[in-house]
């Protein structure tokens, strides 16, 4: 009897561990903090609580909001992803430097996986353009690999789009004051703008990409495509 009880206990503990892996943050705390903010109660304390509850790393973000094709999977957090993102970028009471650190740290290593990350990317680009000094000052303190991972996500797109204009604006404005950052940003843009597919399409399931890939005469001339506004 004791042996059976021990086996059952171990199975329950294992299932609890596996389940917890999907939600590495306290989702009850996060949702509660979100509801307080959307109710109109915006103070330093309520915004700090939301920021503290929100994922801090890309892995936490992915495990909290990712879509898993399983009928038994709880999609409640996946469905709240965009609302939580817009709330994160709307915080005004917390310290600018604290919010900046949270956003940059979260972005490092992030991958374009679909609607949720695309939504985050839209807000991120707007944030960088409005708070470029703050972002670049903090980013410059990180290891170069982390800096490149940050820029990689910023400019990752599956097609050509308005991101090119965002890049040109940021580059022209900061190329002299932050030359190293803009060098990395330029390299990341060169390789990741219109340079990826969503994970489910990787590596060569996109027909248009296949045609380009199979065409030996096709060459993407990056320097002709983008105008940096001078060196």
Q: Language-model features: where?
A:
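Sec/Tat signal peptide C-region and signal peptidase I cleavage site
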Residues: 16-20
């Amino acid at each position: 009897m004791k042996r059976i009880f021990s086996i059952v206990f171990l199975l329950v503990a294992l299932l609890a561990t596996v389940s917890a892996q999907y939600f590495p943050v306290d989702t009850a705390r996060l949702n509660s903090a979100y509801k307080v903010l959307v109710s109109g109660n915006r103070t330093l304390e309520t915004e700090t609580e939301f920021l503290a509850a929100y994922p801090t790393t890309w892995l936490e973000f992915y495990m909290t909001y990712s879509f898993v094709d399983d009928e038994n999977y709880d999609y409640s957090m996946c469905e709240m992803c965009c609302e939580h993102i817009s709330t994160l970028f709307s915080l005004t009471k917390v310290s600018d430097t604290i919010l900046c650190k949270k956003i940059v740290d979260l972005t490092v290593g992030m991958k374009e996986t679909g609607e949720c990350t695309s939504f985050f990317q839209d807000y991120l680009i707007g944030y960088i353009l409005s708070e470029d000094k703050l972002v670049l000052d903090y980013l410059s303190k990180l290891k170069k690999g982390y800096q490149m991972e940050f820029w990689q996500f910023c400019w990752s797109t599956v097609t050509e789009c308005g991101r090119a204009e965002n890049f040109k604006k940021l580059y022209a404005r900061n190329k002299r004051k932050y030359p190293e950052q803009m060098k990395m940003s330029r390299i990341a843009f060169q390789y990741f703008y219109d340079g990826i597919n969503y994970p489910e399409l990787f590596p060569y399931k996109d027909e248009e990409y296949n045609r380009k890939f199979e065409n030996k005469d096709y060459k993407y001339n990056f320097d002709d495509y983008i105008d940096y506004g001078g060196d």
